[in-house]
């Protein structure tokens, strides 16, 4: 490959992100929904925090994602008994969801996905272009600003299902990541 071909390749790559998503809006949505999740967790655990059974602290993490660059997110650290649970944002550049947060305990990890509130499973389509390339996208199209997004518990692949996240579901998640 010549230097001229490489420069043309780089120039073409620079335009890839501007046509598919407004990444600034996506990052704002992601940060806002992370704040909502943290607030929900604080609310669900408030009586246990007040009783001194659980300690909640915030943890900052730097993520680097293609199209978004480097940015800081806040997760949570829960301490109770001799257990430490980390609620860690993973990213927003995902297929089938607008964001993922892992709930990591000593014996298991559970995945929370930011998906369409009405979804019970992923709605993803693949398309093979005339030149043989495979493209994967949400079957519903590019509409992320118009969707009512909600945090849901996602089962492991290959048959991913979503469960509504509320206080009881969150308590179950905590018990699973501690007990396995």
Where are these regions (language model features)?
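Contiguous, amphipathic alpha-helical segments that mediate oligomerization or scaffolding
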Residues: 17-62
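Glycine-rich, aromatic-bearing surface loops/beta-hairpins
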Residues: 112-180
